[in-house]
Amino acid sequence: MDKSCAEHGSFSTLIWADSAENYLRWLEYGGMDVNRLPQDEEEADKATGWKSFACEACQLPASSALMTTNRCNMNCPVCFTRDKNEPLHEPSLEECEALMRRYKELAGDDALIEFCGGEPAVRKDICDLTNAARTIGFDYIQLNTNGIELAKNKDLARTLRFCGLTTVYLGFDGMSDKPYYAKYGKPMLNIKKKAVENCANAGLAVVLVCCVIPGENDGELGQIIEYAKQNMPTVKGVYLQPISYFGIYPHDKIRRITIPDVIRRLDEQCIDISAQDFGPGAYDHAQCSFNACYMLGKDGRLKALTRFSKREREENAVHRLRKNMRATWMPSQNKMLTVGGMAFQDNSNIDLMRVQRCSIQIIQRDGRLIPLCSKYLSSCDGHKIFDGIG
């Protein structure tokens, strides 16, 4: 991607490590008309004429995150949500209930809810908050967590499940301690494994979420898939996020890895996985996500249920996507595994055409829905468009 700014000059950023032909085919298979892509600055201005990072011009989200607290039980050298200069903010249970009701009004009765932070599990009333979400009518409730509280307190997992929690979206960055030192600054693998064990005993579904950092853990993706296989049906998915540079990160170690890179690593490291199993999402922008789905066979091998093929945009695609998330990421005994991921944007590669089709949004304190990449976008000096965690 080439960008030009009157104030900061011109620069280029790698957004797709593959041929131009394959890039355009990926966009086309994601439901985009590549013949209508902007060809010059004037056309680009028309395509993004709304010029807003906020929600008003965006499509409905597949899921939205309620930022429950900016407290955390870690002090990580890499974190895209945290602002060390921000004062303590933890909305009350009543405030959270009001925001969830407002979100349901905006997004529809089949909306999905996520609890984020900070670390949401440090809230003393996290179980009450979960029960409140269920009472409001959410049947898919997801906890985005580092797993520390779940690992040290097996009763917490059981109580959360009893209160209505369905899915644990667990940071899980590798099968050695090397990537945990890079991201968390300390060894964490045993804590992650204990969290998975306690979730399994509680009947919770788990999605392993890996921030893919070149040179740190991109050689361990196959091992993560194997661990997921061994822990089915508790583990329902492996979600890979190529590192983006916003929030807190080491400014002297910026290394890009793109969706094609991640898919190639999976193809090379996993005997059961082929690059041809993956395709783009048809609801969000094709450049944002990739996914495949597998069933565990009697022989212990993963069998692909998906293939790279053209996907047409549907008028009610958001509802189909929500239905699919329920079918694949909620507790069940079926041995199905999704493998996919999302490439978040930062100040070097932010694209308003992608923002406009954001499928994961943040519930703002005032009730608005903000695209995730807009919410956490920060300049090189740390300045953000939107202050605060929520």
List where the protein language model places each region:
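A short acidic, helix-capping loop that chelates divalent metal ions and anchors anionic groups
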Residues: 87, 176-182, 247-250
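Radical SAM/AdoMet-radical enzyme domain recognition
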Residues: 97-114, 123-242
